[in-house]
Amino acid sequence: MAEQVFQNFETLQLHAGYTPDPHTRSTAVPIYATSSYTFNDSAHGARLFGLKELGNIYSRLMNPTVDVFEKRIAALEGGIAAAATSSGQAAQFLTIATLAKAGDNIVASSHLYGGTYNQLNVLLPRFGIKTKFVRSGKLEDYAAAIDDQTRAIYVESMSNPDYVVPDFEGIAKIAHEHGIPLVVDNTLGAGGYYIRPIEHGADIVVHSATKWIGGHGTTIGGVIVDSGRFNWNKHSERFPEMVEPSPSYHGLKYWEAFGPATFITRIRVEMLRDIGACLSPFSAQQLLLGIETLGLRAERHAQNTEKLAKYFESSPNVSWVLWPGSESHPTYAQAKKYLTRGFGAMLSIGVKGDASAGSKVVDGLKLVSNLANVGDAKSLAIHPWSTTHEQLSEDERLASGVTEDMIRISVGIEHVDDIIADFEQSFQKAYGS
């Protein structure tokens, strides 16, 4: 009888990527707190360093605890492999640095997290990599922005903080017609619970694992997932590093040696080796603990967010509500199509009053924390105009969907009545009603 293969999300989050430790039979994933690994002999070490054999060399490249985390996320997202990084920003940077070099560009939605926008708009140009931002979201505008030097299209599965859900299938089709991969930041997709972009044409998925994957605000981390579906050999003119002899490994040809895993292999053996933005085993263990309850948390997050959105829609102190599950949201049709397990765990509101009204409401909250994170089990709120997007110009903030009256809310798993009551009392202090 064939071995049963368990593929449901809630099962994978507990079991994928791990069998009991062979030395101790530990049912929990051990923390391998080591910098390096003993070789069987010199020949074994030489084979590992030459990539003729895969195995542990140094924890900057790989670590057994981190390996379980990588395999589990790859399973949850439907990819062939993953590489963990020190943060979500690191995951993003290493991905683009693997795809592009000086003189190249990427095409990206302008609806992005402020830190992402800064990395694309300010940091990467210092390395000679430019970004063409598409503000409209129209497929024809993505197509028009692509030229011979374009190396990827980059979007967020739900943009932060205005929750634009892109037309993944349409954008993927355009990317593939031009011989470039689609990269999706699926941080707000909660580790693949709300959406698995690979199922809709994405080639590479990145996450800030700090958020819903970890889920408790304890650990900074990132991860890159490779779908294994992009044919680098077919598009070798744009991506010669994927197929031509590598000077790092005595002429090794990645595509010839690793095939569909070419991209993620280069991330590991070049980018993690040279940049060093690796995840520690201690952080990996914390993130693995978070993953074990991811489905349960994500379900409650989505339920609470929907109830809170409906409360805000009826509040006299709120002028507008941005939530992808609302029929009034500009990309509601796409959200309904792609977000099949809930409309996420975030929303934004515009509060009535002058420019200081948003800050007053946030400052008046007692239960909901005012801080620069999302995806915590606890509810969080922030005024993006003066914090997360403060470093952008006014025009850039507006292009990113940030307005002066906006409050961004990451809805936690507390009882929703208590979350609502906290906003009620803050509104009372700010407006007297």
Curated annotation (Swiss-Prot):
It is an enzyme of class 2 (transferase). Its cofactor is pyridoxal 5'-phosphate. The modification N6-(pyridoxal phosphate)lysine is found at residue 211. It comes from the Eukaryota. Fusaric acid is phytotoxic to plants such as cotton and banana. It has been shown to induce programmed cell death in plants. In addition to a mild toxicity to animals, fusaric acid exhibits acanthamoebicidal, antioomycete, and antimycobacterial activities. Keywords: Pyridoxal phosphate, Transferase. One of its GO terms (cellular component) is cytoplasm. GO terms for biological process: cysteine biosynthetic process from serine; L-homocysteine biosynthetic process; transsulfuration. Pfam families: Cys_Met_Meta_PP (PF01053). Pathway: Mycotoxin biosynthesis. GO terms for molecular function: cysteine synthase activity; O-acetylhomoserine aminocarboxypropyltransferase activity; pyridoxal phosphate binding. SUPFAM superfamilies: PLP-dependent transferases. Its EC number is 2.5.1.-. CDD domains: CGS_like. InterPro entries: Cys/Met-Metab_PyrdxlP-dep_enz (IPR000277), Cys_met_metab_PP (IPR054542), OAc-hSer/O-AcSer_sulfhydrylase (IPR006235), PyrdxlP-dep_Trfase (IPR015424), PyrdxlP-dep_Trfase_major (IPR015421), PyrdxlP-dep_Trfase_small (IPR015422). Belongs to the trans-sulfuration enzymes family. Sulfhydrylase; part of the gene cluster that mediates the biosynthesis of fusaric acid, a mycotoxin with low to moderate toxicity to animals and humans, but with high phytotoxic properties. L-aspartate is suggested as fusaric acid amino acid precursor that is activated and further processed to O-acetyl-L-homoserine by cluster enzymes aspartate kinase FUB3 and homoserine O-acetyltransferase FUB5, as well as enzymes of the primary metabolism. This is Sulfhydrylase FUB7.
